[in-house]
A protein has these predicted regions:
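Extracellular beta-strand elements of beta-rich domains used
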Residues: 100, 218-220
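Beta-strand-rich interaction surfaces with strong enrichment in secreted/lumenal proteins
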Residues: 84-90, 150-156, 204-205
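Flexible glycan-contacting loops in extracellular carbohydrate-active proteins
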Residues: 185-214, 237-238
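Short carbohydrate-recognition loop motifs
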Residues: 64-82
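Secretory/extracellular carbohydrate-interaction modules
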Residues: 79-139
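Extracellular carbohydrate-recognition regions
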Residues: 21-59, 229-245
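Carbohydrate-binding surfaces in secreted/extracellular proteins
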Residues: 163-189, 218
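Short, aromatic/His-centered strand-loop micro-motif at the edge of beta-sheets
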Residues: 141-163
Length: 245
């Protein structure tokens, strides 16, 4: 049976990092999103109890160790990138949602780089990059997560779990962190691609940069009927939300 998720009544807007003060990811109430989806069946769990299972380590060169215990993926610190890629059954390329909890346990850079399929390409959500604060999609029209309209600066606490949700539709990508809509990106007519060695994480992968992290409650759920936006997509505008120190 289809499950119905109601996500609010208005769109969320991303903002350029240079126009947005650093703030805590959970300082503000959730921004309503104004769309509904019907899920095509239950969510699929992507982590086993004690082994990598359908995941395999990425040979980045100089990477740390990755392992699974108690349904939690631990990604160790490497010289640069460390991560795993999906080596299991075929994945959807649109109309699906990835969800997980992630935390940084050591290091100062991104603790959740999630590579995922988008139509005929792939994209990567960066959480906590560029010295620990940048959130964004890499790449949009060849611009990475630090320099496109999805770029935001948020503060993240070490050893704190953050709920991360990525919804991929044929025409847009939506990202929530702790139920706060942080990215609403129109991808029609845009070039979606990956930056550098994250291409080794396809078709789906999880990675960190010089950072130790843990991922748990990782699921994938297909979407049966994505709702259309209640109004035409509007370009991102600078955030007017106050920062909280």
């Amino acid at each position: 049976m289809f499950g119905l998720l109601v996500a609010g009544q208005a769109f969320c807007h991303s903002a350029f990092a240079q126009e947005t003060e650093i703030r805590a990811a959970t300082d503000l109430p959730p921004i309503p999103v104004g769309m509904q989806v019907e899920f095509a069946g239950p969510a699929r769990t992507l982590l086993t109890e004690s082994e990598l299972g359908d995941w395999d380590t990425v040979d980045f060169g100089g990477g740390g160790e990755s392992s699974v215990a108690s349904h939690t993926l631990e990604i160790g610190i490497g010289e640069d990138l460390t991560g795993v890629f999906w080596d299991g059954a075929d994945l959807p390329v649109k109309d699906y949602e990835l969800r997980m909890e992630a935390r940084r346990t050591e290091g100062i850079d991104f603790f959740c780089g999630t590579v995922f399929p988008v139509n005929d390409s792939h994209c990567c959500l960066i959480v906590g990059g560029w010295a620990g604060a940048t959130v964004g999609l890499s790449n949009i029209d060849d611009k990475d997560a630090s320099s496109n309209e999805t770029t935001k600066l948020l503060t993240f606490q070490d050893n704190r779990w953050y709920d991360i949700r990525i919804r991929v539709l044929s025409d847009r990508i939506i990202v929530w962190i702790d139920n706060q809509c942080e990215i609403y990106q129109n991808i029609v007519g845009r070039k979606i691609s990956l930056r550098g060695d994250t291409e080794l994480c396809t078709p789906m992968g999880l990675c960190t940069f010089q950072t130790k992290a843990e991922i748990r409650k990782l699921t994938l759920q297909r979407i049966g009927k994505p709702a259309k936006p209640s109004k035409p997509f509007e370009p991102p505008i600078p955030s007017s939300y106050p920062s909280k120190q």
